[in-house]
């Protein structure tokens, strides 16, 4: 039985919800870490995990499927050239969702969503001068 296997509506119409998740997916692929509310983060995981699995098998059909879902040529290129090879040996679990306190205005639970096995960013000049 498939009781309670639906998706979170997030108080949006279906077109608004799909556009928001597409934008969040593109942002996460571009920056590799984003901050959002916890329900959005949990719903984003259901979208982006299959996308990265798609990126592990570079074929024209998979590129077209990815472009159909992402609508961003640069992110499709990054998905297949950078992220697919990075997660070639990992069988799922590409995201880490960390609880990040509560938003000041409406006390919504926030979350930090990041890709696993991110390459370490070198410290910028301002960070090294401050420390």
From Swiss-Prot:
Q: Which GO terms describe its biological process?
A: translation
The keyword Nucleus is assigned to this record = no
Cellular component GO terms held in the UniProt record: cytosolic large ribosomal subunit
Report the SUPFAM superfamilies cross-referenced here. Answer: Prokaryotic ribosomal protein L17 (SSF64263)
One protein family per Pfam:
Ribosomal_L17
- Which pairs are disulfide-linked? none
UniProt cross-references to Gene3D superfamilies, sorted A to Z? Ribosomal protein L17
Q: Which UniProt keywords apply?
A: Ribonucleoprotein, Ribosomal protein
Q: Which GO terms describe its molecular function?
A: structural constituent of ribosome
State the InterPro entries in the record: Ribosomal_bL17 (IPR000456), Ribosomal_bL17_CS (IPR047859), Ribosomal_bL17_sf (IPR036373)
What the record says about family reads:
Belongs to the bacterial ribosomal protein bL17 family.
**Classification via PANTHER family:** LARGE RIBOSOMAL SUBUNIT PROTEIN BL17M (PTHR14413:SF16), RIBOSOMAL PROTEIN L17 (PTHR14413)
Quaternary assembly: Part of the 50S ribosomal subunit. Contacts protein L32.
State what protein this is by name: Large ribosomal subunit protein bL17
